[in-house]
């Protein structure tokens, strides 16, 4: 859902451009959504509930509309529910409940939502869209997006910084795909030729995800070798010190 703007407890290492965008976007959405978040708190709604409902909405938008070729309305529904990721983070901050659990839940459900979106594309191309190549590309986007996220999480779990974000992160994958899907859906309103945007976007996401995966694997390999060399040097130094 909304990684680039706000989430509960997740850290990021954006580029300067992304950091500037995040700064102004965060300030804007905080002003807009704070009253609504406060209203939900007064009604006894928890941040976790908002997270779960938001994910359910994204899944419904993707798997109900996209397989039928209703890309415009599906994207509208998904976009509306994506804002839940900003609301739950705002609520958590107001309640002083930012936690590891919230960060874990957000990240986990983000992966589920991503899978539903690209799964919806795959179902369309496997059915009414009748294009096996684009079905395969959609499945690749789904799988590669999950693996790209896993490489960073796994690298960090073994103590490596994984000091690279890569060419196409989750935010870029979603923006490219959803914007293209929304515009492609205008074909049903009589806009000719615009449906070609979605296949182009899927190819861009697929290639970008592959490049990002390679970037992260290479980075983890280099950092791992450096860490192993540093450990070996430290052990050798301690061994020589003990011998003397």
UniProtKB/Swiss-Prot annotation:
Its EC number is 2.7.8.-. The active site is at 110 (proton acceptor). One of its GO terms (biological process) is phospholipid biosynthetic process. It comes from Streptomyces avermitilis (strain ATCC 31267 / DSM 46492 / JCM 5070 / NBRC 14893 / NCIMB 12804 / NRRL 8165 / MA-4680). Mg(2+) 1 binds at residues 85, 88, 106. Keywords: Cell membrane, Lipid biosynthesis, Lipid metabolism, Magnesium, Membrane, Metal-binding, Phospholipid biosynthesis, Phospholipid metabolism, Transferase, Transmembrane, Transmembrane helix. InterPro entries: CDP-OH_P_trans (IPR000462), CDP-OH_PTrfase_TM_dom (IPR043130), CDP_ALCOHOL_P_TRANSF_CS (IPR048254), PIP_synthase_PgsA1 (IPR044268). Homodimer. It is an enzyme of class 2 (transferase). GO terms for molecular function: magnesium ion binding; phosphotransferase activity, for other substituted phosphate groups. This is Phosphatidylinositol phosphate synthase. Belongs to the CDP-alcohol phosphatidyltransferase class-I family. Catalyzes the conjugation of the 1'-hydroxyl group of D-myo-inositol-3-phosphate (also named L-myo-inositol-1-phosphate) with a lipid tail of cytidine diphosphate diacylglycerol (CDP-DAG), forming phosphatidylinositol phosphate (PIP) and CMP. PIP is a precursor of phosphatidylinositol (PI) which is an essential lipid required for cell wall formation. PROSITE patterns: CDP_ALCOHOL_P_TRANSF (PS00379). The chain crosses the membrane at residues 24-42, 49-66, 72-91, 117-137, 174-190, 196-214. The keyword Magnesium applies. It is a multi-pass membrane protein. NCBIfam families: PIPSynth. Its cofactor is Mg(2+). It is found in: Cell membrane.
